[in-house]
Amino acid sequence: RTSKIIYKPLGTVGIIPAWNYSFSIPLGEVVMSLMAGNVVILKPSELTPFIGLKIGEIFERVNLPTDVLQVVTGDGRTGASLVDSGIEKIMFTGSVATGKRIAESAAKHLTSVVLELGGKDPMIVFADANLELAAQGAIWGAFCNSGQSCSSVERLNVEESIAEEFTKLIVEKTKRLNQDSGDKETTDVAAMSSERQIKIVEDHVESFRREGAKILTGGKRNENFKGAFYEPTVISNATNEMRGMREETFGPTLPIATFKTEDEAVRLANDSDFGLTASVWTRNLSKGKRVAEKILAGTVCVNEVLYTHGIGQTPWGGFKQSGYGRTHGKYGLLELVAPQHIHVNHFLLAPNAWWMPYSSNAVETFRGFAKHFASGSLRQTVKLMPQLLKRIKELRSK
């Protein structure tokens, strides 16, 4: 007898990406879905429809068969119709609230979903870290793409003994950042995506002020520019109880809290509804890996931050309210296929002993095998072979 597993395409995959990385995220998911043999419907964010259409144009140039990839534009109602259409898979990147609605709607059709719903990602800096390197990493992790990344550093937890020195270093480096138009190659921090998003940032920063945190730099719109330009903002005296440390901000803010022990650092990192990514900074790599394995997040870096979405071989996804399912690599491909087990009986000379009809000899044989085979007694099991052959002969005579 032999068994093998083959993988079949699911059928139609619906991809609903967010607006923040509106080219790279859906492009990768489209490629993986097509590689797995599926057809794809891409519904780009209503804020970035032309990028979705551009992805469709790219695949037209490679002579993809007609309608294997379709791009449909529209707002949330279009996305809701896609989810409710009964297709085989939905891959969604976006907010927790929308992700829950998608999961509820998809469940009516038993449509499986992959949900990547953002994070509140912690960065832990121990006293033995390379502080210069960690400071540069924190600034890039917090302010890249104006903080509009699901894996942005949104909570900076620093060991108490170095907190003052490290915070000073962060503030100095933040003040040197160049904020300007995004079409200039030397710009460090550009505008945010929308007025709606900058208002969320303003709301969170004001909540930090009300709850006793200190704004060390930034904390307001950049008045030198028109549009949604918010200054890179560093906040000290933050605690995990503050609203701005619990809700996803998705903007250029870097709130700093402190810890005293390794256990407290882990507890603070895990004290969140989210679990997408995290990072640990220390010269002691054994400690770094030990702490990383205790953190409840889909990806944990040691002395690195933010960029791992670009490692195509590794799974991407989160725990808790950050969603479920994975994209990228082996585990991402397995989300896009249905495993089928093929089993073949090559021995065609006799029936199976457990087939009907049953007899007293059959009952005695089954009890003997259950007792001796399951207990690991090979000698006693072998002694049952004559009885087993008798049972097979009994069936062949029926």
Predicted regions and their residues:
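Rossmann-like NAD(P) dinucleotide-binding subdomain of oxidoreductase/dehydrogenase enzymes
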Residues: 1-133, 385
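Residue-level signal for inorganic ion chemistry
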Residues: 37, 69, 90, 119, ...
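Short glycine-enriched loop/turn motifs at secondary-structure junctions
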Residues: 83-84, 117-118, 150-151, 185-186, ...
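ALDH superfamily catalytic-core signature
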Residues: 97-239, 302, 387
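Conserved C-terminal structural/oligomerization subdomain of aldehyde/semialdehyde dehydrogenase
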Residues: 210, 222, 229-398
